[in-house]
Every structure is written in structure tokens, then in C-alpha cells.
Amino acid sequence: LGFDPPHQSDTRTIYIANRFPQNGLYTPQKFIDNRIISSKYTVWNFVPKNLFEQFRRVANFYFLIIFLVQLMIDTPTSPITSGLPLFFVITVTAIKQGYEDWLRHNSDNEVNGAPVYVVRSGGLVKTRSKNIRVGDIVRIAKDEIFPADLVLLSSDRLDGSCHVTTASLDGETNLKTHVAVPETAVLQTVANLDTLVAVIECQQPEADLYRFMGRMIITQQMEEIVRPLGPESLLLRGARLKNTKEIFGVAVYTGMETKMALNYKSKSQKRSAVEKSMNTFLIIYLIILISEAIISTILKYTWQAEEKWDEPWYNQKTEHQRNSSKILRFISDFLAFLVLYNFIIPISLYVTVEMQKFLGSFFIGWDLDLYHEESDQKAQVNTSDLNEELGQVEYVFTDKTGTLTENEMQFRECSIHGMKYQEINGRLVPEGPTPDSSEGNLSYLSSLSHVNSLSHLTSSSSFRTSPENDTELIKEHDLFFKAVSLCHTVQISSVQTDGIGDGPWQSSLAPSQLEYYASSPDEKALVEAAARIGIVFVGNTEETMEVKILGKLERYKLLHVLEFDSDRRRMSVIVQAPSGERFLFAKGAESSILPKCIGGEIEKTRIHVDEFALKGLRTLCVAYRQFTSKEYEVIDRRLFEARTALQQREEKLADVFHYIEKDLILLGATAVEDRLQDKVRETIEALRMAGIKVWVLTGDKHETAVSVSLSCGHFHRTMNILELTNQKSDSECAEQLRQLARRITEDHVIQHGLVVDGTSLSLALREHEKLFMEVCRNCSAVLCCRMAPLQKAKVIRLIKISPEKPITIGCWDGANDVSMIQEAHVGIGIMGKERRQAARNSDYAIARFKFLSKLLFVHGHFYYIRIATLVQYFFYKNVCFITPQFLYQFYCLFSQQTLYDSVYLTLYNICFTSLPILIYSLLEQHIDPHILQNKPTLYRDISKNRLLSIKTFLYWTILGFSRSFIFLFGSYFLIGKDASLLGNGQMFGNWTFGTLVFTVMVITVTVKMALETHFWTWINHLVTWGSIIFYFVFSLFYGGILWPFLGSQNMYFVFIQLVSSGSAWFAIILMVVTCLFLDVMKKVFDRQLHPTSTEKAQLTETNSSIKCVDSLCCFPEGETTCTSVRRMLERVIGRCSPTHISRSWSASDPFYTNDRSILTLSTMDSSTC
């Protein structure tokens, strides 16, 4: 082509159709193929790679070390005791991950093997998707999915445009228009494309779906033509072609370098407060384990210092043992004790927690109260790792538009040339009395006629001044609505289904036959309003825009579009009128338009904008500028240079936009209404009652934001509203913050609300962060207006890292809000009608803001209660399990004799005690869901991770240690030293004694779980009592047969011997009742003396028509403690149908039905109690 391609690392050069230079001096760049690989493993690397990933987890690695120690040295327990549970956990996880990866392989093969047509050697060749190379020209037909990231070359339309939907990428269902450059748009056949000689230079792959910079250099008749390429030219892999027969595009990014593949990379992992607490507890128990092992080792050597205990006759040392190093023996004994006590660390905790989170997350999607019938949207769970975090929220950060409001804009009022109008039935009516007005209104439709594309007010106009003023007023009105009709990115679909987009296709259609769609609802509302007034936008091509003005078609040449961005907060178009005049029309926030204006009714319009904002309306200002031919030539050249730049294109474009968008003439302002969603006020008030602070972060102007905050209850009328706005310097900002802090201190009795704008916020965070945070912490509600997206994310991070480390939620609905959702501890996406990018990138997605109350107060409350109890109970039952093993060493002179049989050691956590806590963690409801939602104050009872505090952790730990003492010493004293408890005069041996302790322990920890359960179903009964029955049946079976593959038969007939002894049964019942009686007494006294709000609500529930869900500890108010204890003992002993819950029971579904309650479980006949 006569030039050397660039070799910068941040750009790539693509020769269309892979026609490389023939001069031999060019070395083609290497690009990857078009295969998509979403799988993690292959047949050859699955085992080593999966094992490596699993053993990176601390718990798995710990048990692997224990297993290896058991293999290397002589330990008191079989390696099977730690090896089998570890093998079970690793195997289950590997099977799950292997199956998921197999599904990914199948999906990859289906995608990579999809048939596509590629232009090669002057014809269409059918091949597979994986064979597409960068530079290939690909043909895509209607409704097909793009197999790679393509730059559009041509379509079946004359203007080279096409429509696509990107719903699978960003969730937006509206059609997007993409256009080809003019030089390739005419190449609509394979033969024509075969003559194309062109090169594309573009940036290297990146994940941003909305960013693409490049240029196409076309050689025609030995002349090079350079055209800029942007996002409008790029067709993304995964998007679908719509309303277009076929297109041709050249592949620029393939395979794992496509934007779709780059966006599939996992998000940064969020860790919940419960997970952090669990890791802390693991470290504490690891310290306890090491301490017990060290103490045991020291005591062993202290004991054996006396000769009579050194070498008992049954355990004589060998010569090698006598001569071995004491240090090595000490280490060996320490490791042996470590193995003996290692089960204090629960290996199955991680697996159980993962299962609980995964299965529990389905309840959110199944909840009909979170289903929005109008949009047919149910709640979505994109991550199950944060379920319990929903019960710990202290701050809610939310956007206004689309989150608190419906995002359905309706044009209400406008200001034109310093006069205010409101729309009534397609007529612009001036507000207030007008001179010489007989009817009191102005019909714009009847008052406009056009001469040379300008309108004038006819004699029928109800508002007349002088002819000169009329002409000026007419021009301003005309330009205002032309600006509204031309300055936008709205697209059109009509009643026609074919041929859409072929030139001026809508010219003959009536406005009622046109349907506008746009990514911005503001633009759609304004264009529709202009159409009702009489200036109808009827279609556009790449180069023209057409409007009908009172039935007369006018075609404007679209010269340039200066796209909207959040920094400028405005957009502009440069058009050429039929008269040849060139105009720039701009619209945007008043803070971005008014400073650029040098003419027009600036002050009057500013007042009108403030008045609109006080009504809660969204405002935009409209302005224009007319260019001379010389001015336009300079602008056109500078825009071309900036748009064709491959380096720093965005910065260069920003400079050019700043140069163009100045010296504007203000035309007026628009005001559209975005009404609040249903029950927003009630939801915000409920959040406030729950102790959750709500911050609204919006880009709207100050007055609009305050008005909406008042109307939605974010600010209430009795609240003292403080303002930190319009600050110009650091010193001024600091002084204002100090004044606000003093006012809060002086008026500490009343609630305060704070309003901050983006400029003042930047100053406050720059030098006065601590002072600003002090003011915010003492405010019940904070409103941040005129905020840029980056500022929103920064505010959330500021609260997250504050000393209190509060849990935050971010609620947003827009694609530019993803960073805020990902910054918050929990991201909540609001599923709008057309904007679902935020929902897809969130942790949870709901259809309406009002659903947030049930998500937090019911689901969050239940999830936290369940998993907090699960974690504490797991450590409790393992303390009960291992502490007797430690205490037993005092009786066997620390000889490392195990108390339990190896099979019991292996199955305790896997089979005997795992299911009751798992079912509890899935189904538990300690109080009726409706009460939780109607009494938001109950949310405070679980805030700040109360159930996993050090105090609660110590209670469960001490409880476990105390029960362990009862198990061991109770068994020892009840069966008696040297006592004969069998009919044949024999005594209990070591294994019988250990089995007795184990039996009491299994029954006690299982019934303890029953005491903690408030919500009983047949599943709870099955797994709770079934676990105890299974233990007895298994023990009878295990001890009743001689198993030839076992190394020893220590347990043969042991359990049968135990259960045949009446004394043993007496000991079992007495110890179980003793342990549980103490638990029951503590529950009664706590509820009588220090009841929480939740427990008081349970008492209320007891006396209401809904029966109490706390089957053990809910008693009528005024009942004496003695009576309460008697009732509780009756319930413990005769625990028939514990809850008697009346929640729309369903006999048809044995598990649950969802009838607008979180769970509805199958009934049991309460009359039997």
C-alpha cells in the first residue's frame, strides 16, 4: 500500500481479506485463532490441576499434612480416620468441578463448530467458526450471531447500516444501529469485496464493550483514503443481527481476544463478614489444637520421668527407642497428639457452608414476593457467596433515576426564549397570564407557518407583541424544537417490517405510525414531545436526518455527532440545513451548557430551570451555534485528525469538543418527569427504622435531587437539611464543614440530612476527609448530587474503609454504574426495561427498589441466622467430640490411646451429625417472615455480626468444653470404677467406655440442634431423629459382624453389650437430660430477664393467630419462670409437632410451596400436641 505499518505494542494492523504487501518487507503479525475456551481442564491435566487448586485451601492442606503424618510415623489412629474424610471432600468437589467443566467443553465444541461463511478466493466458503482468522471477511445473515468481533464493511442497505441486539452481552434489548464507512458500504457483493484493498489499524483487545478506536485506510485508484472507526463500526461477538438481510464484516478480534471472552473473566472475589469470622475461629481452634498437643507431650514426658511409669510391662521400649534422640521423640509424640486431636478442626465445615449457600440461594429466585408481574422479572442471584451479608447491611447507596424512579420520562414543561410553557394535549400553553390573551393559551401547531425553514406566528396567535419581536420569538421557537428533533441518537421502528432503514423510509408515515427507541429515555421523551408539537423526526441515515415540520419534509445533512460523555455532560450535533447554513445544536445539564453560552435569555432560563427542578423534574438546556464556512473547515479538519488518531484519541477529541462547544446561544430548557416507583417511600422509611443509612448518589442538579429526596421520604419534613454546596476553595469547604459539625452538635436531638454536590465533595475528600466523615456519620440521610460515576465509587470506598468497617450495598440500574456495584460489599442491580448491564454485573438483581426490604429484612435475616448458627454449631460439636479425647489422656498416662474407634472418628462429621445442621441452615425460620418485614427494627438484633462475635463464640466454645466434661466424667462415675454392670459379672472395657461417651455425645449434639430449631418440617424430623436412629442401626450392624477386611475386631459385640445394659441406658438418659436441661434453663432465663426485640416479637407471635415458631421458648407474657420451665420440659420430653405454624399449608407439595411467603412447609396435625 506504499506505507510501513506501525509496530507499536498497543495497536494492531489488519489487512482485509489477508492481502499482505507483495514487496516482501512485511512480516504478518501473529493472531490467535477463533476458538473459545471456557473450560479449565483437559483430560490430561484434570487430576493434577484440580488437586493443586483444592489443596491451596488451608483446611484441605491441613488435613493432607495430618494424613501424611499418620502415614510416616506411628500414630494412635489409623490414617483412614483423616484420609477418608479428606478423600470424600476432595472427590465430591472434583466430581462437581469435573462435571461443570465437561458441560463447558460441550458448550465450547458447539460454539466453535458452528458453520459460518467466509469470503476467500473470490467466493463464499463454508467453514467452522473456530477456523476464522483475523482479516477474514465474514458474511452474516439475519438473526445470526456474530462469530467474532467484526468491523462492518457493508450491508444489504444502501447506507451500509444494520441493526443488532446485544442482549446476551449487556442485557439491553433495544436495537442498536451500526454503520459502515462510505467507501465500503457500496461493496454489497462478494465480487465487489474481492476488489477491496484496505488496512485497519486499531487498538489491542480490551474488555470495555463500548470502547473501540481505529481507522481504515482504503486504497482507491492509487489514492489512500483514511476513515475513523469507532464503536458504531464494531459488531461484537455474541450480538445478533436484526432487521437486516445480511452484512459483511472483517474479523479484527478472534477467540479469547473478543470483547465477549474478555468480559467473562471472573470478578474480584468478595468475602463476607461471616467468612472472615469463620477464618478467625479456625485460627483460634488451630491454636487450641497446638496447645493441647504441646501440653499433652510435656505431661507425657513429665509423667514418664518417674521410673515406674516409664516402661510398663505391656509397652516395653526397644533398644532403638531407648537410644533415639529425645528431640526426635518429642517431635514424634507432638505430631502423634496433633493427629489424635486434629478433629477439633471440622473438615466438613467448608463443604457444608458451600452447599448451604448454593442451595439456599434458590429461595430468593423462588420467592413470589420478589417477582414483578408487569415486566415478568424475578429476582436473580448471581453469586451465592454473600447471602448472609444481606443481613448485615448498615449503608445503602442508591442512584435516583431508574432505581428510585421508573425511568419512564414524560415531557411536562419547557422554557423558550425566557418564557415558560407546559404541554397540554399536544399544545404548548404559556404559564401565567399573557398580553392580549383571549383564550389564555398558545397553540403552537396553529400558530406556526414556515418561510425559508423559519416559522412565524400567524394572526391567530394568542400572544402578540410587535412584528420585530414576533420574528425573533418565532425563530427561537423554531430553532428550539429543531434542536430537540435533531440533537439525539434516537432510532425509529415503524409499522413496516421489511425494508426498514432503506433511505427516507418513514417520510410517508404519520407520527402515530412511528415508534422511537433510544438508550436514553430523556431523548425519547423529547423527540416524542417535538413530534406532538408538530416537528416530527422521521428517520436518519449515516449522512442525513429528516424531519417533518407541519407536514413539510426537510432533510438535514448530518456532518458530525459529538457524543455524550459523563465528563462533559452534554452532546452535540453539527448539521447542514437545506439552506446550506451549518448549525451546532447542543443539549445537556445546565451546569455544562449555561457557562458556554454568550447569548440568549440566560438568567431567565436559569430561574426557570431551578423552578422546574423544585418540582422534581429533570432538566436539560438547549443551545446552538452557527458556523461560517471557514470556521467549519477548521472544525472538520480538527475532528478528522482527532478521530483518526490511534494514540490518545479520547484526549484529543475532548480538546476538540471543548473548542467547538463554546460561544453558544441559549435557546431554552426542557423539563421531563420521571415518577417514583411504587412503595419507594415505605421502603426507605423501613430501611431507616432498621438502622440502615440511605445515601442517594445522583448526577441530577441540586434542586431536582432535593425535591425527589423529599418526595420519596429520603428527607422528611421534620429533618434539618444541611448543605455543602458551591464550595470554591479548600479553606471555604473546611470552614463550612466545621460549621455543619457545630450545628449537628448543638441540635443533636433532631435528625439531620446532608446535601453535597460533586464539586464540594471533591474539595472535602481532598484535604478534609475525616471532618467530612464525622459530619456524614451524624446525618440520618445523605444526598450527593451532580456526581460523576468515579465519584460515586469513591464515596462507597470511603465508607467501606472507615474505622467502623460497615457493610454497604450499592443499588443501581445503568451500565455506567457497574463500578459502584462492584465496589460495594453487596451489589444490587435494578432490572430496568432496557438497561440490564448493572443487573448482570451485580451480586443480586431485583426488578424494583421496593423488593429491597424483603431481600434484607427476611432473606438476609434468615440467611445470617442460619449460617451463623451453622458455623458456631460446627465448632461446638467438634469441641464436644475431641475434648473427651484430650481428657482421657490423663487416665492413660498420655500414652496416646484413642477413646473412640477409628470408624466412629471417620463417620462422626460425615454421617452422624452433618445432616441436621445442613437442613437447619436451609429451612430455619425463627420468626414469621411477615413479622420480620413489618417490624424492620428486628433487623438491628443481628447487625454488626452479633451472632459471630467473640462473646458468642466463647459461649459456644465453653458450652462445648462443659459438655465434654459431662460426657467423660459422667460416664466414668456412673458406670463406676471396678463396677460390674453386666449380667454375667463382666466390667465395661475401654472400647465399651468410649462407645458410651460417643453415644451420649451423638444424642446430645443432635438434640441440641433440635433445641435450636424453631421451624419444623417433616424433613427436619426425618434427618434429626433419623440421624440418631441411623447411628444405633449402624453401630449394631458394625459391631455385630466380624469384618474380615478390618485389621482388628475391637468393636465386635461392643455396642450390643452396651445397649443390653440397663445401667448404660440409665447413664445415657441421665447425661443427655443433664446437658440439655442446662441449655433449656439458660434459654428460659435469658428470655425472661434479657429478651431481644426478636424474642419479644416471638412472644407477640405466640399470642396472635399465627402460632409461635419457637417451639421451645415462646411463652405468654406474665407467665412465671417456674411455669415456663415446666412448659419447656413438657415440650422437650414430648416433642410432637413443635411449631404448629399456620402459613397457608399445602398438602400437595411435601416440601414447600411459595405463596407470597418465604417458605410454606407441609403441615402436621397440631391437634396431636
From Swiss-Prot:
Q: Where in the cell is it found?
A: Recycling endosome membrane; Early endosome; Endoplasmic reticulum; Golgi apparatus, trans-Golgi network
Task: One GO cellular component term, please give it.
Answer: nuclear inner membrane
The cofactors required by this protein are: Mg(2+)
What membrane topology does this protein have?
Answer: Multi-pass membrane protein
Cytoplasmic compartment segments: 1-47, 97-281, 352-868, 923-952, 1013-1017, 1083-1169
Q: Name one GO molecular function term.
A: ATP binding
Q: Which reaction does it catalyse?
A: ATP + H2O + phospholipidSide 1 = ADP + phosphate + phospholipidSide 2; a 1,2-diacyl-sn-glycero-3-phospho-L-serine(out) + ATP + H2O = a 1,2-diacyl-sn-glycero-3-phospho-L-serine(in) + ADP + phosphate + H(+); a 1,2-diacyl-sn-glycero-3-phosphoethanolamine(out) + ATP + H2O = a 1,2-diacyl-sn-glycero-3-phosphoethanolamine(in) + ADP + phosphate + H(+)
Which residue ranges does the entry give as Extracellular-facing topology?
Answer: 70-74, 304-333, 891-902, 975-989, 1040-1057
Q: Say if the entry is tagged with keyword Metal-binding.
A: yes
Q: Name the job this protein performs.
A: Catalytic component of a P4-ATPase flippase complex which catalyzes the hydrolysis of ATP coupled to the transport of aminophospholipids, phosphatidylserines (PS) and phosphatidylethanolamines (PE), from the outer to the inner leaflet of intracellular membranes. May contribute to the maintenance of membrane lipid asymmetry in endosome compartment.
The record's comment on protein family reads:
Belongs to the cation transport ATPase (P-type) (TC 3.A.3) family. Type IV subfamily.
Name under which the protein is recorded: Phospholipid-transporting ATPase IF
Which taxonomic lineage is given here? Answer: Eukaryota, Metazoa, Chordata, Craniata, Vertebrata
GN (gene name): ATP11B
